[in-house]
Curated annotation (Swiss-Prot):
Domain Glutamine amidotransferase type-1 as annotated: residue spans: 297-549
Region listing for Amidoligase domain, in residue ranges: 1-271
Binding positions (ATP): S14, L15, G16, K17, G18, L19, D71
Annotated family: Belongs to the CTP synthase family.
Binding residues for L-glutamine: Y54, G361, F389, G390, M391, Q392, E412, R477
Activity regulation annotation text: Allosterically activated by GTP, when glutamine is the substrate; GTP has no effect on the reaction when ammonia is the substrate. The allosteric effector GTP functions by stabilizing the protein conformation that binds the tetrahedral intermediate(s) formed during glutamine hydrolysis. Inhibited by the product CTP, via allosteric rather than competitive inhibition.
Protein name (database record): CTP synthase
Residues reported in the UniProt entry to bind Mg(2+): D71, E145
Length: 550
């Protein structure tokens, strides 16, 4: 029997519902249960694929090609369970489905309304089969996070749907966890419970009585305040769980267990004989985080550095590499535009970095700065890791400054006679521009999800991966033009990874450099704290070695 846990939020956004959901999922896993996490996003966009990184943050891509909320990255990293298209839905998708059904006549002339049609679609999504990763057995728990905060007009159909589900499901098969905020007013020297009381009041006004309150706070909650919250919010004192700020997100499962969150959830379900949790791997990570053997500094040369959430999986993957090497990873965020117009700016800013990371991005803005970062890394022999756009800029840099093709560019930046990088429907064959269409082998213009690649035997990447066959997640419209492969190789930039048909360049590396690798895919999306991605583990190892040399 699958049980359902609904995680809602109140008072303010960005309290960490996704992280709380992931941590609770990890605690249930530690007790031997199978879990799956799902996210309901109330925005009207069909998916976040076209949303600005400054508004939405990272777009997390699943193996089956879904563009989803960054919280699914937390789910995967904490539980190790790969998410799918069936684990994220938006209001836009729901309305799109309903309108298509109405146009087909599926509703037989009925008036289409929020209740029951929208709420039924939401309930159908939540109750859709949730299988373990083998696909053979249903999971024990489905954790469902509702985006936004209680009181948001966009979220009302979702709250109504989960209200109905408590009545639809058998007794003791659902649990409401409400994440809220207990602000500490420094001038008054006291913690305020009123925002939490009002948040729960709003939740109860729409028919939902939370079973557990997870209270974000900067300081410990006094016992009398817990009793006060319990009394006014109609929960047991033991169900008021303290969620203090933590120095590391990977300490959160341990903290929540010590506060009794998982035990309280199991009590709601009447599961009093649940196995004790094995938190040894979380404790090992916490030990490494708090007692590293050293530090490395990675310069991250990006376009969206104002909002760090735009690089959420990348940040975590770099820290996973640090865990693998038992070092603390310090990130120096560099806006790539600062390198444009000043040739010495890159050298001055990157001088103290042990390694350089150039992540993905879209558009011409900041591209020249990323090219200069790649040039600095190549010339100074500093470890360089280029992902997606970062690989493409490394290729352009080599062809401009080593091969002598001074006008090498990308068709993403506008018309060019030297499209070293082109959209996947544009390729140069001889003197002709070849147009590929959606029904050709390469498909459309956006490559999403997991694709296989073949590595060159004996290459650095083959050694790092420990084999020549890999599968990685992609999200891009532009590719390095295979027609320039020979010039790249002549310039020392070896093409050591391709699609199985040999057409699409996937990986480049320099043989005359201690660690210079560019990849077209996004390896950060598959990194886990317990299984750091091999490229990130190797990259941080190279940075650690660089630190010994300088």
């Amino acid at each position: 029997m699958t049980r359902y846990i609904f995680i809602t939020g109140g008072v303010v956004s960005s309290l960490g519902k996704g992280l709380a959901s992931a941590a609770l999922g990890a605690l249930l896993q530690a007790r031997g249960y199978k879990v799956r996490l799902r996210k309901l996003d109330p925005y009207l966009n069909v998916d976040p694929g076209t949303m600005s990184p400054y508004q939405h943050g990272e777009v997390f891509v699943t193996d089956d090609g879904a563009e989803t909320d960054l919280d699914l990255g937390h789910y995967e990293r904490f539980t190790g369970v790969s998410a799918t298209k069936a684990d994220n839905i938006t209001t836009g998708q729901i309305y799109k489905t309903i309108i298509e059904k109405e146009r087909r006549g599926d509703y037989l002339g009925a008036t289409v309304q929020v209740i029951p049609h929208v709420t039924n679609e939401i309930k159908d999504f939540i109750l859709s089969p949730a299988m373990d990763e083998t696909g053979a057995k249903p999971v024990d728990f489905v954790l469902v996070e509702i985006g936004g905060t209680v009181g948001d007009i966009e979220g009302l159909p979702f709250f109504e749907a989960i209200r109905q589900l408590r009545q639809d499901l058998p007794r003791n098969q659902s649990c409401y966890v409400h994440l809220t905020l207990l602000p500490f007013i420094k001038t008054a020297g006291e913690m305020k419970t009123k925002p939490t009381q009002h948040s729960v009041k709003e939740l109860r006004s729409i028919g939902i009585q939370p079973d557990i309150l997870l209270c974000r706070c900067e300081q410990e909650i006094p016992v009398e305040e817990k009793r006060k919250i319990a009394q006014f919010c109609n929960v047991r004192p033991s169900a008021v769980i303290q969620a203090m700020d933590s120095s590391s997100i990977y300490a959160v499962p341990i903290d929540y267990h010590q506060e009794g969150l998982d035990a309280e959830v199991l009590d709601v379900f009447g599961m009093h004989d649940a196995p004790k949790p094995d938190l040894s791997r979380w404790e090992a990570i916490d030990q490494t985080v708090n007692h590293p053997d050293g530090e490395v500094t990675i310069a991250v040369v990006g376009k969206y550095t104002v909002l760090k959430d735009a690089y959420k999986s990348l940040i975590e993957a770099l820290h996973h590499g640090g865990l693998a090497n038992k070092v603390k990873v310090n990130l120096d965020w560099v806006e790539s535009e600062t390198f444009e117009g000043d040739e010495g700016a890159a050298a001055a800013r990157l001088e103290n970095a042990h390694a350089i990371m150039v992540p993905g991005g879209f558009g011409e803005r900041g591209a020249e700065g990323k090219i200069r970062a790649a040039q600095f890394a190549r010339e100074r022999k500093v470890p360089y890791f280029g992902i997606c756009f970062g690989m493409q800029m490394a290729v352009i840099e080599t062809l401009r400054n080593v091969a002598g093709i001074k006008d090498a560019s990308s068709s993403e930046f506008g018309p060019t006679e030297r499209p070293v990088v082109g959209i996947m429907t544009e390729w140069i064959k001889g003197n002709e521009t070849v147009q590929r269409r959606a029904n050709d082998d390469l498909g459309g213009t956006m490559r999403l999800g997991a694709y296989d690649a073949v590595l060159t035997p004996g290459s650095k990447v083959a050694q790092i991966y420990g084999g020549t066959a890999i599968s990685e997640r992609h999200r891009h419209r532009y590719e390095v033009n295979i027609g320039y492969a020979h010039r790249m190789e002549e310039s020392g930039l070896k093409l050591t990874g391709r699609s199985p048909d040999g057409v699409l360049p996937e990986i480049v590396e320099r043989e005359d450099h201690p660690w210079f690798i560019g990849v077209q895919y996004h390896p950060e999306l598959k990194s886990r704290p317990f299984a750091p991605h091999p490229l990130f583990a190797s990259f941080i190892a190279a940075a650690k070695e660089q630190g010994r040399l300088v």
